[in-house]
């Protein structure tokens, strides 16, 4: 292994290392570990890995006052469809999450759980095997031929969820949020980005409904806002957040190709700001930058340059977490962190650098990540990345 080939800059004297209040917590700095899918949970059961997960989160929360957002976790079995991603609905799952939350808190850092519902990005055959539906906003609006073939082969065609099923998903979000808070989490992040179920309702490419959940900008936003309102009522606005990817194309979303989507996200943010002015301000809004339109592309590939996320500041006046290719572009991180109430998320860099916050603070070189091990069921590429001192001792070079 080696260090990444770029010139880091010390960020200690920038806005990134100023404290900020998020919900009920006081962060020492604005470097955030965003949700990172790692596929190490046990199957069956979707249980966080009892051998490795606590150590993984302990390592990355070692700098006191750091905000950690967990990998996406399924609120219910129906929300899932990936065998090795964790859930938060069973006691067996929650028993492991409690250990993870304790490890993070023992480091004097903070933890938010991302609540993740796949919709049509699930594997239809996995769901069929478990007696579960293959859900989305609309019937049989598949991402592509492979997904269609998989669904038909497993006799589990894509199903546009009914109003009663929408209500059940909302109950699932609420139940999961309460369980996470009761287990010791500081808050929850509702995943409404990257082409997953809530994003499928927001985007007209996947939402072909003709009822009150489809058609207009207001209708397409209804499900998302109902989830937010229900979770806020259950655990408090200060413990609730949400993620969007306005320009993302992952999951065959429209991204920048459909100009109505900027208006769509501006509308949702405006509705959240209305609620904030009425005393229910979310802890933060998490935005994936157009610098990353798909999580499977290397740095600076797939960069959509026809728009920016700057519009958020005209609408939403609360905290903003911005995520996307900041590790190799410290100047962009410095510039964007000058915006009001802004935090910066580092994804792949946090995977490969357990002491990332200290490295960013001091301008130290970063470990090169190993992409093939991102989703590999092993400790390798998960809990064996060295700290800077360990890397130097091993002879790492650029």
UniProtKB/Swiss-Prot annotation:
Q: Which reaction does it catalyse?
A: butanoate + NAD(+) = (2E)-2-butenoate + NADH + H(+)
Q: Report which residue ranges the record marks as coiled coil.
A: none
Q: Which keywords are on file for this protein?
A: Flavoprotein, FMN, NAD, NADP, Oxidoreductase
Required cofactor names: FMN
In short, the EC number is 1.3.1.31
> Could you say which enzyme class this protein belongs to?
oxidoreductase
Q: Which Pfam families match?
A: Oxidored_FMN
Question: Mind telling me which InterPro entries this protein's record contains?
Answer: Aldolase_TIM (IPR013785), OxRdtase_FMN_N (IPR001155), Oye-like (IPR045247)
The family database entries (SUPFAM superfamilies) matched by this protein are listed as: FMN-linked oxidoreductases
User: Which residues bind FMN per the record?
Assistant: 37, 191, 243, 348
Chain sites annotated for binding substrate: 191, 194, 375
| GO molecular function term, any single one | FMN binding
The reply on keyword Ubl conjugation is no
Cell membrane recorded as keyword: no
* PANTHER family for the chain: NADH OXIDOREDUCTASE-RELATED, NADPH DEHYDROGENASE 2-RELATED
Q: Which family does it belong to?
A: Belongs to the NADH:flavin oxidoreductase/NADH oxidase family.
* Complexes and interactors: Homodimer or heterodimer.
Q: What is the protein's given name?
A: Enoate reductase 1
Species for this entry: Kluyveromyces lactis (strain ATCC 8585 / CBS 2359 / DSM 70799 / NBRC 1267 / NRRL Y-1140 / WM37)
Gene behind this protein: KYE1
């Amino acid at each position: 292994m080696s260090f990444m080939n770029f010139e880091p800059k010390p960020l200690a004297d920038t806005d990134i290392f100023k404290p900020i209040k998020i919900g009920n917590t006081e962060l020492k700095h604005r470097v955030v570990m965003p949700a990172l899918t790692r596929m190490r949970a046990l199957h069956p059961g979707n249980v966080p890995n009892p051998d490795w997960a606590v150590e993984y989160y302990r390592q990355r929360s070692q700098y006191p006052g750091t905000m950690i957002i967990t990998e996406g976790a399924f609120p219910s079995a129906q929300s899932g469809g990936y065998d090795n991603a964790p859930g938060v609905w069973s006691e067996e799952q929650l028993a492991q999450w409690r250990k993870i939350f304790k490890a993070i808190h023992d480091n004097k850092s903070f933890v938010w759980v991302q609540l993740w519902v796949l919709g049509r990005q699930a594997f239809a055959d996995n769901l069929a095997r478990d007696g579960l539906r293959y859900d989305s906003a609309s019937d049989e609006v598949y991402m592509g031929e492979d997904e269609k073939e998989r669904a038909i082969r497993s006799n589990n065609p894509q199903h546009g969820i009914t109003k009663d099923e929408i209500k059940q998903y909302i109950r699932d979000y609420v139940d999961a949020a309460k369980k996470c808070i009761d287990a010791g989490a500081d808050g929850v992040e509702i995943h409404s980005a990257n082409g997953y179920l809530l994003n499928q309702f927001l985007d007209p490419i996947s939402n072909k409904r003709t009822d009150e959940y489809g058609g207009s900008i207001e209708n397409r936003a209804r499900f998302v806002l109902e989830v937010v309102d229900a979770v806020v009522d259950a655990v408090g606005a200060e413990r609730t957040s949400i993620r969007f990817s306005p320009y993302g194309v992952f999951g065959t979303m429209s991204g920048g190709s459909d100009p109505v989507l900027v208006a769509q996200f501006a509308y949702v943010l405006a509705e959240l700001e209305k609620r904030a002015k009425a005393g229910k301000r979310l802890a933060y809004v998490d935005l994936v930058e157009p610098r990353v339109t798909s999580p499977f592309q290397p740095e600076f590939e797939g960069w959509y340059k026809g728009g920016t996320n700057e519009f958020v500041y005209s609408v939403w006046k609360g905290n903003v977490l911005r995520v996307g290719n900041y590790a190799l572009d410290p100047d962009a991180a410095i510039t964007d962190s000058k915006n009001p109430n802004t935090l910066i998320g580092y994804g792949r860099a946090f995977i490969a650098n357990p002491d990332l916050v200290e490295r960013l603070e001091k301008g130290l070189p970063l470990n090169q990540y190993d992409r093939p091990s991102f989703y590999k069921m092993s400790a390798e590429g998960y809990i064996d990345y060295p700290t800077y001192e360990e890397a130097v001792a091993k002879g790492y070079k650029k």
